[in-house]
Swiss-Prot record:
This is Arsenate reductase. Disruption phenotype: Deletion of the gene leads to a complete loss of arsenate resistance, but does not affect arsenite or antimony resistance. GO terms for molecular function: arsenate reductase (thioredoxin) activity; metal ion binding; protein tyrosine phosphatase activity. Gene3D superfamilies: 3.40.50.2300. One of its GO terms (biological process) is response to arsenic-containing substance. GO terms for cellular component: cytoplasm. Potassium binding stabilizes the enzyme and increases its specific activity. Activity is also stimulated by sulfate. Inhibited by arsenite (mixed inhibitor). Belongs to the low molecular weight phosphotyrosine protein phosphatase family. Thioredoxin-coupled ArsC subfamily. InterPro entries: Arsenate_reductase_ArsC, Ptyr_pPase, Ptyr_pPase_sf. It is found in: Cytoplasm. HAMAP family: Arsenate_reduct. The active site is at residues 10, 82, 89.
Amino acid sequence: MDKKTIYFICTGNSCRSQMAEGWGKEILGEGWNVYSAGIETHGVNPKAIEAMKEVDIDISNHTSDLIDNDILKQSDLVVTLCSDADNNCPILPPNVKKEHWGFDDPAGKEWSEFQRVRDEIKLAIEKFKLR
């Protein structure tokens, strides 16, 4: 069976999409290639790294990347995680499905916001896996 590809996209590839990539690799397992990117690059937020470390997922080696058109075109599913990414997502080929899963941006907010958004992303990916 060929691996499917899921591509998580948000504005800066700093918090939400980084956490989604970490959870995606953990939850979806070997059957999926999991990537993340941003409309811009803001660097991986240290609090996102810490939030994921708290649940034993290491994203410290992740980099903040711009959308890669090759990955985009080969994706089975592109998931936008904020309205900016949803509105500015490049045109997708007809074979690529797109979904919007909106999450609040925890950047610049209290630690508890990082934990809440992290946990909401986990639940969304768990629900997706059950489809």
